[in-house]
Amino acid sequence: MNQLVVAFPFWHWLVEPLQYEFLIRAIWVSAFVGLVCAVLSCYITLKGWSLMGDAISHAVVPGVVLAYALNIPFAIGAFTFGFGATVAIGYVKSKTRLKEDAVIGIVFTGFFALGLVLVTKIPSNVDLFHILFGNVLGISQQDIIQTLIAGSITLIVILLRRKDLLLFCFDPNHAKAIGLRTQVMYYTLLSVLALTIVAALQTAGIILVISMLVTPGSIGYLLSDRFDHMLWYSVVSSVLSCVLGTYLSYHFDVSTGGMIVVILTTLFVIAMIGAPKYGILAQEWRKRSGPNPEDDENQTVVVDQV
């Protein structure tokens, strides 16, 4: 056996983490979270809701703290405060002359600050570092169940309302004109966004979860005009980053969420530079070759070809 290890050091490096049950559990949980985030990421990217995702991810902090203090599932507290923040944003926006970005900034920082106050004042077993950056390597069985439930609900809702959500994200005015209840779609998308953040909380934490919600869809958006292909690229890049990031975090003894996002960002940079049609190199080549009529269409064919 020792001779085999010496002869095949890479194989030993590869299989060593698989000897530990906690790491195997962390890998498949991360992969599931990556799948959920990737699917929703395509809709968030088309809708331009990256800031909304950031707001909700910060707003769940007081919910998590209170949930642990009251000994109730963290998913309930996180979803309640996350969705509550979106309702607050919509209410303040409708009652004032402030623009949405200003309202989002005010609401999410207020919720986040409340969470920090609660962390320091309410006795609980909540580790602020784990809230901020995740703790998938130490995830409990109860947290896994909550993550699976939240993620599964998100996937089911998106599957059932896929076309309606896509039309709402791409052209809400047209969706309203054909009789689609855009207000329902608005809160449906916000609900699954809050659920996805709850699912990803243990893997990436509130600081890094926004990257998992935005980057996969952005990668797919750069690589393809078709929404189904965009979805495929998004899922592959996200799941690959989650599995590889969890794996490498063990070997290099670094933050799992941080490593996942580093790999995901690296894939984005590669796509940004080398995407066949919308990459930097392709655009520079077209500039030197002369104008291309297809450039005027940009990404509007995403929905046309679904």
Curated annotation (Swiss-Prot):
Which InterPro entries does the annotation name?
A: ABC_BtuC-like, ABC_TroCD
A single GO CC term for this protein reads: ATP-binding cassette (ABC) transporter complex
Q: What is its main location?
A: membrane
Please indicate the ranges of residues that lie on the Cytoplasmic side: 47-48, 93-101, 163-179, 224-228, 277-306
What keyword terms does UniProt attach to this protein? Cell membrane, Manganese, Membrane, Transmembrane, Transmembrane helix, Transport
- Reading the lineage from the top rank, the first entry is Bacteria
Topological domains annotated Periplasmic = 1-25, 70-71, 123-141, 201-202, 250-255
Disulphide bonds in the chain: none
Query: Which BP terms from GO are recorded?
Result: response to zinc ion; transmembrane transport
Q: Does the keyword Membrane apply?
A: yes
Q: Report membrane topology.
A: Multi-pass membrane protein
Q: Where are the transmembrane segments?
A: 26-46, 49-69, 72-92, 102-122, 142-162, 180-200, 203-223, 229-249, 256-276
Compartment annotation? Cell membrane
**Function, in words:** Part of an ATP-driven transport system for manganese.
Q: Family, per the entry?
A: Belongs to the ABC-3 integral membrane protein family.
Protein name, UniProt field: Manganese transport system membrane protein MntB
Encoding gene, per UniProt annotation: mntB
